[in-house]
């Protein structure tokens, strides 16, 4: 504790007797409570009353000792002391004298809902949720409140680890066989220091106000859900996997987003810097991306639906993945491979495209484009019949296809098995049987 508070030798000398008296007062305030699980209904009610009395007694001791600690500590050190120990009611099991409860053979929600106050949240920096917890970050909350079935709530835990609020179930015993029908709701106050959210199996976190911070690290998996808007943040790292879901808008300086294994991300992304986004393994992303630089990779059955707007962008679609949406990029590099497909209205100065292995790239719209370079192979297809391109440089081979419109100069190098259809007033440098005007 002394190390946590960073006390000087002089402070330690004055702090020790006060802290010793404080701990003794806590011990006197807490009364033992019988295990309500093995008792009848009346005994369970009595145990609940005793538990609440313990919480009130602990709160009173902490309140009484604020002024005593103030003789030695600053207000911030007192706050840190109570945070480090676990604030009033944070760990109900400790206040009740139940520190090592294990889940029984079968734990099934009774349907009888009860609510407990677990005390103040403090200046927490992270939230971590175990299975079945649904956490709401509320601007109107003042303390942590937990609502669950009356036969479940005594098996819930809150640990504080370096500023992290970690919600979980008590450890399973060797005889635990089934956990079912659990509904656990937690409401926590807002913390300006929040930087991380980690959501586990069938759990969720929802923020009822936009989250702000220098950097954010958010992850969810195994059907975990997060609903939150991020604004004015720095570097943001977001991972969605294993049927997890993230819903909300993101405004940040830079982003690293990953959606995989049937994960779902719904919401727009706006970056002042670089946005690195990957969607794979049948994951899906539905939302516009706006950034100075966009690096988007969609693969392995992944899906992206939304507009891309950037000064420069690199888009890659492969392995049966799909991408669709408007592309407003001054300098675009795009590759489509392995039966991937990309379709969208393009507006920009330059485009460099590579399409192969049954990939399909369709650039729609009638915007004026300065230069487009296309490399086609292995039955790849490129289609931009209405795009007003000034200069084209196309190389096509291995049964690939292209359909284009050109206004100035059209350079084509095509193998005998490739086919190119063109239109427009542009001058064609090469003419052969497989290069034809529409």
Residue ranges and their predicted role:
Residues 79, 420-421:
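A short amphipathic beta-strand at an alpha->beta junction
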Residues 2-6, 12-15, 338-368:
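Short, structured interface segments that constitute the first stable element of a domain
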Residues 1-108:
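Charge-rich (acidic/polar
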Residues 62, 391-396, 410-414:
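Short leucine-rich amphipathic alpha-helical surface patches
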């Amino acid at each position: 504790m002394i190390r946590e508070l960073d006390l000087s030798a002089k402070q330690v000398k004055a702090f020790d007797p006060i802290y010793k008296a404080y701990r003794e007062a806590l011990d006197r305030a807490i009364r033992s409570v019988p295990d309500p699980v093995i008792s009848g209904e009346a005994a369970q009610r009595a145990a609940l009353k005793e538990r609440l009395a313990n919480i009130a007694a602990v709160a009173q001791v902490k309140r009484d000792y604020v002024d005593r600690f103030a003789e030695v500590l600053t207000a911030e050190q007192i706050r840190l002391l109570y945070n480090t120990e676990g604030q009033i009611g944070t760990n109900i099991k400790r206040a009740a004298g139940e520190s090592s409860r294990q889940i029984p053979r079968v734990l099934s929600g009774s349907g009888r809902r009860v609510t407990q106050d677990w005390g103040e949240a403090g200046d927490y920096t992270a939230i971590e949720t175990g299975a079945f917890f649904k956490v709401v970050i509320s601007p109107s909350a003042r303390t942590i409140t937990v609502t669950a079935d009356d036969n479940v709530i005594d098996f819930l835990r809150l640990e504080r680890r370096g500023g992290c609020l970690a919600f979980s179930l008590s450890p399973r015993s060797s005889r635990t066989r089934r956990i079912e029908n659990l509904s656990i709701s937690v409401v926590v106050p807002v913390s300006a220091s929040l930087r991380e959210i980690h959501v586990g199996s069938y759990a969720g976190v929802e923020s009822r106000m936009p989250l702000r911070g220098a950097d954010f690290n958010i992850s969810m998996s195994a059907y975990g859900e997060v609903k939150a808007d991020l604004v004015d943040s720095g570097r943001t790292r977001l991972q969605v996997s294993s049927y997890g879901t993230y819903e909300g808008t993101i405004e940040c300086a830079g982003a690293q987003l990953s959606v995989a294994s049937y994960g779902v991300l719904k919401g727009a992304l706006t970056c002042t810097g670089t946005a690195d986004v990957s969607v794979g393994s049948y994951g899906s992303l539905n939302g516009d991306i706006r950034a100075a630089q966009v690096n988007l990779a969609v693969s392995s059955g992944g899906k992206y639906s939304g507009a891309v707007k950037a000064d420069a962008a690199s888009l890659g679609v492969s392995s049966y993945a799909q991408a669709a949406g408007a592309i407003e990029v001054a300098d675009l590099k795009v590759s489509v491979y392995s039966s991937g497909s990309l379709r969208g209205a393009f507006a920009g100065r330059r485009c460099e495209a590579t399409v192969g292995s049954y990939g399909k790239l369709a650039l729609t719209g009638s915007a004026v484009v300065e230069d487009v370079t296309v490399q086609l192979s292995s039955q790849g297809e490129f289609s931009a019949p209405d795009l007003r391109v000034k200069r084209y440089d196309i190389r096509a081979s291995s049964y690939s296809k292209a359909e284009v419109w050109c206004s100035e100069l059209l350079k084509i190098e095509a193998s005998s098995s490739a086919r190119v259809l063109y239109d427009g007033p542009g001058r064609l440098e090469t003419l052969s049987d497989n290069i034809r005007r529409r």
